[in-house]
Design a protein with these regions (language model features):
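Cytoplasmic membrane-interface "Motif A"-like loop-to-helix N-cap segments
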Residues: 65-80
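Multi-pass alpha-helical transporter architecture, strongest
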Residues: 90-92, 170-193
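A membrane-interface helix-boundary motif in multi-pass transporters
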Residues: 71-74, 153-176
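Transmembrane alpha-helical segments of major facilitator superfamily
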Residues: 45-53, 139, 143, 175
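Extracytoplasmic gate region of multi-pass secondary transporters
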Residues: 3-60, 115, 119-120, 149-154
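A late C-terminal transmembrane helix in Major Facilitator Superfamily
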Residues: 129-161
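Hydrophobic core of transmembrane alpha-helices in multi-pass small-molecule transporters
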Residues: 97-119
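C-terminal ends and interior cores of transmembrane alpha-helices
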Residues: 81-95
Length: 193
């Protein structure tokens, strides 16, 4: 895969996976230790995250093709900002059960749109048809490797700070910001050759 845009997409997708897996894999612990929810309540809140993530991936293609007429950057910007704002609200505000469901639902819907648009649609747009499998393989490899690294880094940060989630929350927020900023500032490299 020689197109430099695929490597940009792979890095962006890696940050998507860091962000998404942070919520899906550490969200229950965060809700319990950071916000005082019971295990049952925390698990129920995070369950909404998974359902809305699926809806976001379904919504991505329709938004990109029908609403924005093939412009991939507008849905990435809008959903990226929604993702960042809802993640910030989830991590840095109190809120009860219902409000936290709204935070994770909006976050997951938005991150689903970012992921599907960047890692799927943009990647397929810029490579020749014969290279799509290799391109998506590179993106997938970077994504899953980053998710694994995120688990290690997050676990160390949470453990080292005695369940003070402020430092790891900054890591997650910065990853969220990078997941949509990277393709937006690299738009010239994300054109078909």
């Amino acid at each position: 895969v020689r197109h430099p845009g695929i490597w940009i997409i792979a890095v962006s997708s890696a940050f998507v996976y860091i962000t998404q897996h942070a919520v899906s894999e550490w969200g229950v612990l965060f809700l319990q230790k950071g916000k005082g929810f019971s295990l049952a309540g925390a698990t129920q809140i995070i369950a909404f995250s998974e359902a809305f993530g699926i809806a976001g991936t379904v919504l991505a293609g329709w938004l990109s093709d029908k609403v924005f007429r093939g412009n991939r950057f507008v849905p990435v910007l809008i959903s990226g900002l929604l993702c960042l704002l809802s993640l910030g609200a989830f991590l840095f505000t109190a809120g009860g059960y219902s409000l936290n469901i709204i935070y994770v639902s909006v976050f997951s819907l938005a991150i689903g749109v970012v992921y599907c648009t960047v890692a799927g649609l943009m990647a397929l747009d810029i490579v020749p048809r014969k290279a799509t499998g290799a391109a998506l393989g590179v993106v997938g490899l970077a994504s899953y490797a980053a998710a694994g690294v995120q688990n290690i880094v997050s676990g160390v940060m949470i453990g080292e700070n005695d369940f003070n989630f402020a430092p790891v929350s900054v890591f997650w927020i910065v990853s969220c910001l990078l997941c949509f900023l990277i393709p937006l500032v690299s738009w010239k490299s994300l054109r078909r050759r």
